[in-house]
Amino acid sequence: MIFDKDDFKAYDADLWNAIAKEEERQQNNIELIASENVVSKAVMAAQGSILTNKYAEGYPGRRYYGGTDVVDVVETLAIERAKEIFGAKFANVQPHSGSQANCAAYISLIEPGDTVMGMDLASGGHLTHGAPVSFSGQTYNFVSYSVDPETELLDFDAILKQAQEVKPKLIVAGASAYSQIIDFSKFREIADAVGAKLMVDMAHIAGLVAAGLHPSPVPYAHITTTTTHKTLRGPRGGLILTNDEELAKKINSAIFPGIQGGPLEHVVAAKAVSFKEVLDPAFKEYAANVIKNSKAMADVFLQDPDFRIISGGTENHLFLVDVTKVVENGKVAQNLLDEVNITLNKNSIPYETLSPFKTSGIRIGAAAITARGFGEEESRKVAELIIKTLKNSENEAVLEEVRSAVKELTDAFPLYEE
């Protein structure tokens, strides 16, 4: 049974209507979740292509099934483009997600039970950097490092001292909620000083790295992992990079047959076309605008004494705001903003005192609104609308004003041009 879009609507109206409602939600909402973005129609077309039919266990030129000549071309395009973007000698484009990429990196670098240092979740790390609820924290002996309690910045002297004490086999750098530049060369110096390997998870900043607007970890890390969405503006998926041939072999084996079976070649195709977009000079302009818009929003909060920006500002696509002077917690803030069609997420802040289901902060990202065409003026307006909402949470007239302002912005910058 092969049918076109109109047949799909008639065949499964329930699913069609759900997708249509999500399209409407995305069009009419201001999206500030830092891990989300808006992909191109080319990315969606590739991901929805006939390649979804093809099973292709293995790697280009070394498949377990026949009929893979074409998908070999597709995957090779993705690999070569990824290598060109990040200046890496080897790339694996098959990971289904960033977590899968991290899992494969760990398998390639260490053994179960080995000691690993990773960034504390409340300081900005990720679940896969050693959280007890994650496979990482359950498989390896993770010891967390934190940001400085005063500056809320990475303290490399403290990290070195901690590394000398715990003697890790691996140090993991990278974050999901850290708004400042990360000096990967210092992390490599620390790793070398204690005889550890360095792995960098650059999932959040990969697009900025690709555009040359954040220092690249690739020359310093033994293995670099990333997602292909977020600031890279591709499909949801993972990517692993290295300059070490022996590690590249281990990575390939860790992905297949280690933790995955057949790759999702339709997603690999979507990665390939998104990588071509990243190689276009227009992407560097986009990435620069992401940072400008992030700073523009942060500046509005910095001028209001009722809010506190973690670490005092931002140098990338996101920042955290302590909202506890204005509302009870981050969850309350998230829910209030949902009501006015502004979407973001509650987020723990360094040395958090509330549960991760409530949190003291919210995380604000600029990647998706920038993809829609928002500039600094619109970004400042968005920050003002957030503040207006949180300070007038029980004033329905004010909240309706915010909804109208949100609608004006989303109408002015459609998700996709017809």
UniProtKB/Swiss-Prot annotation:
Localization: Cytoplasm
Keyword Transferase belongs to the record: yes
Binding-site positions, (6S)-5,6,7,8-tetrahydrofolate: L121, G125, H126, L127, E246, S355, P356, F357
One Pfam entry name: SHMT
GO MF term set: glycine hydroxymethyltransferase activity; pyridoxal phosphate binding
Cofactor(s) of this protein: pyridoxal 5'-phosphate
PANTHER family, alphabetized: SERINE HYDROXYMETHYLTRANSFERASE, SERINE HYDROXYMETHYLTRANSFERASE 1
Similarity comment: family membership: Belongs to the SHMT family.
Name of this protein: Serine hydroxymethyltransferase
Native source species: Streptococcus pneumoniae (strain Hungary19A-6)
Origin organism lineage: Bacteria, Bacillati, Bacillota, Bacilli, Lactobacillales
Gene: glyA
